[in-house]
Design a protein with these regions (language model features):
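Trimeric beta-solenoid/beta-helix "fiber body" segments of extracellular/virion adhesins
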Residues: 1-33, 88-90
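Glycine-rich, low-complexity segments
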Residues: 21-54, 76-78, 134
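Short, surface-exposed charged micro-motifs
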Residues: 15-17, 43, 102
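Extracellular attachment/recognition segments
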Residues: 50-124, 130-134
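Generic recognition of flexible, low-complexity loop/linker segments
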Residues: 3-5, 40-42, 100, 113-114
């Protein structure tokens, strides 16, 4: 087995790895994904020997006392491991926030249920999942 490491030449902290096993290279995987909105990252993490993917999804402004569903755009999503964290422009973490009563990730959407409003700022959620194709 051969391991190949690469870093972003522009000074970003991006670190990628891949392996050659019996002359066949595995896909590039992120050690520290940069988490740009809407980009899916295959990571070096594993769950039941399957690669874990991460994606940051813009969920917009959140009104008080409502549920909002936003399509995450993930194809072939398998096990939804978690909504790792969610943030708004004020730096509030939405996971564990008393103003957020639930964040649910299903096969198509992220649904956020609120008790308090976050309508004056944008929000986004980072999800972690496996894929049925791996």
């Amino acid at each position: 087995m051969i391991r190949q490491d690469a870093w972003n030449a522009l000074g970003q902290p991006d670190h990628f790895v891949r392996y050659a096993v019996d002359g066949v290279w595995t896909p590039w995987e992120y050690v520290n994904p940069p988490m740009q909105l809407g980009v899916e990252y295959r990571t070096t993490e594993r769950h039941n020997n399957k690669p874990v993917y991460k994606k940051a999804v813009n969920t917009g402004a959140l009104s008080a006392g409502t549920s909002k569903s936003v399509a995450h755009g993930v194809q072939d999503i398998g096990l939804r491991l978690s909504a790792l964290y969610g943030l708004n422009n004020d730096g509030d973490n939405l996971v564990g926030n008393p103003g957020i009563t639930g964040i649910l990730v299903d096969g198509s959407n992220i649904t956020i249920t609120t008790a308090a409003g976050f309508s004056t700022s944008n929000s986004w959620v980072v999800i972690a999942y496996t894929k049925t194709t791996d």
